[in-house]
């Protein structure tokens, strides 16, 4: 019995030492990693993709309209083994291993592709599009404290954002569909659209630039400002929400 107890204590002490050496803390929600050392760069091979799904604290720098030639990761050395980057059915997934989180800082990922059709983001992640994004349609699904900054020329852009997401758009499209709830901040005042459809609630603050029409509804204390010259508008407001031309 004493041998078993001693062996168990040795095992527990060993686990604690390993966790301490790797700076990994365990709790009921999983494992938290603290970055150690200066950031290094790692290059990984990936397959072709036209959709991105990103979770956790990643800063994605996406180059539009270039061939996919792998991706690079900039992070502390002790984080690399916990970073998952994989492509399945045309979707690039970027995340941490299950039940892991980072104590402080973001991981930078640089990647590009010829086309991009959809992006799904959750957590404290960001997407910065370098260059002009062109194509038929882009779907953006955002939640948590995610943020997007892009310039594009598209036929249609569909955005579904919740939480405390931030959105900055430049360029143009024919049809813009915006569904915003929570404390969303969206600046599309330099993103010229023909037709815009909105559903905005909570404390969301949205700026658009519609040249033909705006349709939709606002509730809560949300606000919508139109920097365009649209004249065929059908916007229903309730609560303390507001819609106005600038």
Task: Kindly give the residue locations of the regions a language model identified.
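Intrinsically disordered, low-complexity terminal regions
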Residues: 1-246
């Amino acid at each position: 019995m004493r041998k078993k107890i001693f062996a168990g204590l040795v095992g527990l002490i060993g686990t604690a030492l390993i966790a301490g050496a790797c700076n990994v803390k365990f709790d009921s929600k999983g494992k938290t990693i603290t970055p150690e050392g200066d950031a290094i760069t790692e290059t990984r091979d990936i397959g072709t993709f036209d959709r991105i799904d990103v979770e956790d604290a990643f800063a994605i720098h996406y180059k539009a309209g270039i061939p996919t030639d792998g991706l690079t990761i900039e992070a502390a050395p002790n984080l690399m083994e916990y970073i998952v980057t994989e492509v399945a059915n045309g979707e690039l997934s970027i995340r941490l291993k299950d039940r892991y989180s980072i104590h402080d800082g973001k991981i930078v990922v640089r990647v590009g592709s010829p086309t991009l059709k959809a992006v799904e983001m959750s957590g404290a992640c960001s997407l910065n599009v370098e260059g002009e994004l062109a194509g038929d349609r882009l779907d953006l699904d955002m939640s948590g404290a995610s943020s997007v900054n892009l310039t594009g020329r598209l036929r249609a852009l569909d955005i579904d954002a919740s939480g405390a997401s931030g959105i900055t758009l430049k360029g143009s499209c024919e049809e813009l569909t915006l569904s915003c709830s929570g404390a969303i901040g969206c600046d599309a005042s330099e993103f010229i659209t023909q037709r815009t459809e909105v559903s905005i609630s909570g404390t969301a603050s949205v700026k658009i630039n519609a040249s033909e029409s705006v349709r939709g509804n606002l509730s809560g204390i949300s606000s919508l400002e139109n920097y365009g010259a649209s004249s065929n508008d059908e916007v229903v407001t309730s609560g303390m929400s507001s819609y106005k031309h600038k």
